[in-house]
């Protein structure tokens, strides 16, 4: 193994094709309740592999790691063998790795882009690891096996389906504005996060957690907020409405033009009525938001939330489209919209599918336990406890 410091470790992770933000030193700062363990391997004086484990109560977990060239089977074998040794010396009771390797990539409606078997499962098996299978359920693994990603070599918004382009235009027409904000706007982001938690009956993250992401990753974290300045929107739309009325008066007997103006007037009146129903303070409402992180040549939407009260404004479509366009302008190659269920039939998958993404599938998790007792603890007892605790916290939140 190779001697290194944090800067060298991060440089390798950030430059490697298989690097991921969860293998960076900053991720351990976010997960401060876990103890980090980092290892690096070199050949001819140059680093060729690295891994960051986070350990807690005997569990050693490497999210999207180790980072290395998985086509180099000799290197993979050496790294896995060394990991078995260092985790045993470190007192690990249970080791879980989630290698950043795809088993397949396809478009949302096509299975033609497939990766062949790399023999990865066999290599892990030879070192005593068990593959946890190819479950499609989002909740079956710590990190989602399926992600929806959008290649950024496209022209936006032309690359989106027709309906998506219409919804984006609809958001602009309804005075939705998307801005990149700083940590000082986290309280606004939490409003849409809480609205999402209530709507879906889930618990996401606290404001302190999101603040820790900003503190650890700095400029690599961006907060997008979609807002409406309601007073300004009402004033501008009222002016637009009056202009349409005036134009209709002076149209004369041209039936086609008159009919078009009549439809525009009705649409404008409907928008004024809709804006008038909004409850707000300080003139501005937060429609939706998303927290984005940069890693290597890609970006990922880590968390997103929407207030259902403003669902008719299509803000989430404009927000996602803005994130993609910004990422392309900044020179990134790909944007991940985050994890989805593998069957692609849930509401989250259906929403993300409207941006014509590719679906990528990771191999999933490989586990190794010290003995059968610890295998039972980490595979059955601990997940059962966590599920009960999660339900109790959700119930307590509902009763407040």
Segment roles from a protein language model:
Residues 61:
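Catalytic phosphate/metal-binding cores of nucleic-acid and nucleotide-processing enzymes, i.e., regions
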Residues 305-314, 339-343:
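Short, contiguous acidic/charged loop-to-helix segments that flank catalytic cores in large enzymes
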Residues 73-85, 312-325:
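Conserved acetyl-CoA-binding loop-helix of GNAT-fold acetyltransferases
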Residues 2-58, 102-107, 117, 127-141, ...:
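A conserved beta-strand-loop-helix scaffold within acyl/acetyltransferase catalytic domains
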Residues 288-292, 300-301, 327-333, 349:
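Extended hydrophobic/aromatic segments used for targeting, binding, or gating
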Residues 88-108, 328-339:
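Conserved GNAT acetyl-CoA-binding A-motif
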Residues 109-155, 329-400:
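Active-site/acyl-donor-binding loops of N-acyltransferases
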